[in-house]
Every structure is written in C-alpha cells, then in structure tokens.
Amino acid sequence: MAILIDENTTLLVQGITGSFGARHASLSLAYGTKLVAGVTPGKGGQKFENIVPIFNTVSKAVNETGATASAIFVPPPFAADAILEAADAGVELIVCITEGIPVMDMMRVKEALRGSKSRLVGPNCPGLVTPGLGEKSHGGCRIGIAPGYIHKRGNVGVVSRSGTLTYEAVFQLTQLGYGQSTCVGIGGDPINGTNHLEVLDMFNNDPETEAIIMIGEIGGNAEVDAARWAQQHCKKPIAGFIAGATAPPGRRMGHAGAIVGGEEDTAQAKKRILAECGIAVAETPSDMAKTLLERWGK
C-alpha cells in the first residue's frame, strides 16, 4: 500500500530546466518514477532528455498528462506562487523542495490551501520515496532529492524534519535487512504543509507499515503533539530521535524552525515527552534503527 505515493504515481516537475531540478528529475527517471511532465514558463514545447514534454503552465501539463503529483524546484521568491499554481491546477500532492521561502509567503500559502484537495509536503524538505522491488529499490517512486539506492522495500515508515537524518535512518534499516514502506521528509521550516501527526496517522492506517521511525529536532511542538496523539491512537511500535541536544536557547541551528523558544522546544523536553508517550527514544543518530528493532521485538 505505502502512503501518499506509489509506483503508479504520475509526477510533474516545476523548474525542470534549472540545474538542480534537471539533476533530480533525471535521477527520479532513472529510479523508475513515472515522470510525465515538466513545467518551465517560456520553455513549452521542448522535451527533457528527449522524453518528458515541457509545458509553460501546470494546468496545461495536468490536462495533457494527468499528473497527480508535483515536485517544485523553483527559487525562493517564486516558490509560493508555484505551490499555488499547482493547487489551482488540481495537483493532489505538491512537494516543495525549495529552501528559504519567506515566512509571510508560506503564511499566504497555508491559508490558501485551507480546505483544498491538494496536500503540500515541505517546503525545505528532501521529499518522499516509496521504494520499488527492483535492484537498489528501483521501480518505486522518488519525489525530491533523497538518494534512491539506499532504500529497500519493506514495512517501516519513516517521517522526519531532517533530510540527512532521514537518509541515515533508511540506510541503517536497509543494512540490517529491514525495508521501508514510505519515507516522508516533511521539512524543517516553521510553517509547513504536512506535520508529523498527519504522517503518523497515515502510517497507522497503512496495512503495509508495521513500525515507524519519527525524527524531529528542537523548535516547535510538532513532535510533542504527534507523540501525545500516538499514545492514544497508534498501535504500531515507534522509535524517535530528537536532534539538537546541545543547541543553546534562542539560536537557530540549521533549519529555520530549529530554534528553542518555549519549555517544550528543547531536545531534552521532547525526548522526555516522547518516552512518556511510549515511544522508544534513540540517544544518538546511529541508534535509530537499532532502537526501533528493540521496541519492535525483532
């Protein structure tokens, strides 16, 4: 089953002719993702790698190809409008990779998407991967920038605010012989489209997902909200990791949202609350998979 995406998901890439977008569109194609369209204003009629048609607008791309998901590789000043254009075109899943989108722009996007049929993942995220059954997990769906080859098809769901920690958890699981159902990078900005709790809910309802790794960091209360929800509603084993244990209060650490503001924003407080809610907490990044397997009884 997986969540959000599978091998049948049809993808368009906004910003496909930029160097970053082109690089990762090419990698997604090689992974086996059904990349059916690209969008760059003024480049309509061209083809990406002589295969994928490029359109001037998202609505034209959706009408011509039936794309159901979009990956956005658009510079920060234009990314909010790119998200809204995809939503207006009826794209079901919008994955925004762009980092550095102004907070006011994201507030406008968040309000505009309220009640919309479109789901936003990101911004400032690595995207999603549902591994395939081929060699190095090829044949699945890769949207974003995550390295596909470290994945393996299996039964562990991964949700994370951090891209690199997502890859670390995935690699550990794969090395130990345990694959992933879907890996979701929700992004590290203070305002994002999809949070930990929503992804946990999807994993909880997914018959293919048997266990979950949830990775968070200092700042905000998303992990705390998710843990308290899971205590009441999630029957599947969860391991958690919170980054930023040595971060000084009031200083941003990497992600725009990674800043200690309130009492429950610290790594120590989040780890304590996760443990109180029945989540097995890994003390270091290298312990994430091992901690899950211990809780899972594997």
Summary of predicted features, one role per range:
Residues 1-298:
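Catalytic-core regions of core metabolic enzymes
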